[in-house]
C-alpha cells in the first residue's frame, strides 16, 4: 500500500478480506491520506496492476482501517484463523512490504501474548496509540510491514503486524527490527473490520469511568481503582463509585487498567456483564450494560 499526501508519503501492507476489494490495514498507514491524499494498492502476482483505493473506515482506538480498491477486481481473500488458542512458542510468519520491498516473508515464533505497547500516531501532534492484548513475535517486522499479515504454520492470518520496538527509537520514530515486533490479534481485528465495512466506524464497550492501576507494588488489592464515574454512565447506573477497585469482569481477573480494557473488549456495546469490585475491603458485584466509549 503506497500512500501520499501534500505533506508526506509512505508505504504499508494490507490483508485482503473480501474478493470485491476490501482490505484491512493499520489506521496509522492511511489516516493522514484519508481526506486529502492518494492511496495506491499494488498486488503481488501475474497480471496484477496498481490500483487506487479509498478509505472505508478508520478506527484510531485499535489502529485499524479498511480500504477498498476502485473498479471491478476479483481478489483472493486471505484465510483468517483465530488468535484465541495461540501459545507462546508457536511458529509464525510475517508477510508484508518492509522498506517498500513487496512480498517479503520473515519467520519466527510467538514470543509473548497480551502485551500493551504504543504505536506511532498518524500525525506528529497526536498521542501514540496504545495497543492492548498485542501478540509479540521475533519474526522480523520493519517499517512498511504495518498492516500486513502475521500467519500461523497453516497460512492462516492470526494477527495484523502493527509496531516494533527498536534500539534508539521512540514511539514516533522507528529504526530496524531487533526481533521485538507486535501484532493486533485477528479476533479483535476481524470484529473491528466487520464494523468498519458495515457502518464506516467501530464501537468500543466502556463503563464510563476513569481509573488507575493499584496494587502493582504488592501493597493492597490489585485491580483498577475508579477515580471518576461519569453521571448517567453504565457504571453510575450500576452503583459504582470513585474509590471502588474492579478486580474481575465476568469470570476473568483484572489486575490493572490495561487488563480492564482487554476484558471489556471481549464484549460488545449493549452486552450485560457482571463486574466484581472492592469497596472498603468488602467484595461486591454489579450487573451493568456496556455503553459505547464514544458516548461515555
Residue ranges and their predicted role:
Residues 1, 37-45, 94-95, 273-277:
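Short conserved beta-strand and strand-loop elements enriched in small hydrophobics
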Residues 2, 24-27, 87-98, 112, ...:
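Active-site-proximal beta-strands of protease catalytic cores
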Residues 2-22, 48-54, 76-79, 105-106, ...:
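A conserved glycine-rich beta-strand in the N-terminal activation segment of trypsin-fold
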Residues 4, 19-20, 26-61, 72-74:
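Catalytic-histidine neighborhood of serine endopeptidases
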Residues 15, 22, 84, 90, ...:
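Structural motif
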Residues 54-56, 73-102, 184, 194-198, ...:
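Active-site substrate-binding loop(s) of clan PA
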Residues 70-78, 109-178, 207, 215, ...:
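Active-site region of chymotrypsin-like
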Residues 191, 195-263, 278-296:
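PDZ/PDZ-like groove recognition
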Amino acid at each position: 500500500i503506497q500512500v501520499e499526501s501534500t505533506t508526506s508519503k509512505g508505504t504499508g501492507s494490507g490483508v485482503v478480506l473480501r474478493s470485491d476489494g476490501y482490505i484491512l490495514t493499520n489506521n496509522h498507514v492511511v489516516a493522514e491520506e484519508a481526506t486529502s491524499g492518494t492511496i495506491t494498492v499494488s498486488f503481488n502476482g501475474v497480471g496484477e496492476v496498481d490500483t487506487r483505493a479509498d478509505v472505508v473506515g478508520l478506527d484510531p482506538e485499535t489502529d485499524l482501517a479498511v480500504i477498498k480498491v476502485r473498479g471491478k477486481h476479483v481478489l483472493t481473500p486471505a484465510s483468517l484463523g483465530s488468535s484465541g488458542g495461540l501459545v507462546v512458542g508457536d511458529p509464525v510468519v510475517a508477510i508484508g512490504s518492509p522498506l517498500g520491498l513487496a512480498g517479503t516473508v520473515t519467520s519466527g515464533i510467538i514470543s509473548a501474548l497480551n502485551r500493551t505497547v504504543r504505536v506511532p500516531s498518524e500525525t506528529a501532534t497526536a498521542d501514540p496509540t496504545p495497543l492492548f492484548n498485542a501478540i509479540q513475535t521475533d519474526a522480523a517486522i520493519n517499517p512498511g510491514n504495518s498492516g500486513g499479515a502475521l500467519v500461523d504454520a497453516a497460512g492462516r492470518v492470526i494477527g495484523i503486524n502493527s509496531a516494533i520496538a527498536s534500539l534508539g527509537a521512540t514511539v514516533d520514530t522507528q529504526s530496524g527490527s531487533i526481533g521485538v515486533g507486535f501484532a493486533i490479534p485477528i479476533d479483535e481485528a476481524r470484529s473491528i473490520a466487520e464494523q468498519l465495512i458495515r457502518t464506516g466506524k467501530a464501537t468500543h464497550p466502556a463503563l464510563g469511568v476513569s481509573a488507575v492501576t493499584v496494587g502493582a507494588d504488592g501493597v493492597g488489592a490489585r485491580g483498577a481503582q475508579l477515580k471518576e464515574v461519569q453521571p448517567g454512565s453504565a457504571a453510575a447506573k450500576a452503583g459504582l463509585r470513585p474509590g471502588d477497585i474492579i478486580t474481575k469482569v465476568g469470570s476473568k481477573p483484572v489486575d490493572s487498567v490495561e487488563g480492564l480494557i482487554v476484558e471489556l473488549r471481549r464484549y460488545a456495546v449493549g452486552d450485560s456483564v457482571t463486574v466484581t469490585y472492592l469497596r472498603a475491603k468488602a467484595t461486591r458485584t454489579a450487573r451493568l450494560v456496556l455503553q459505547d466509549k464514544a458516548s461515555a
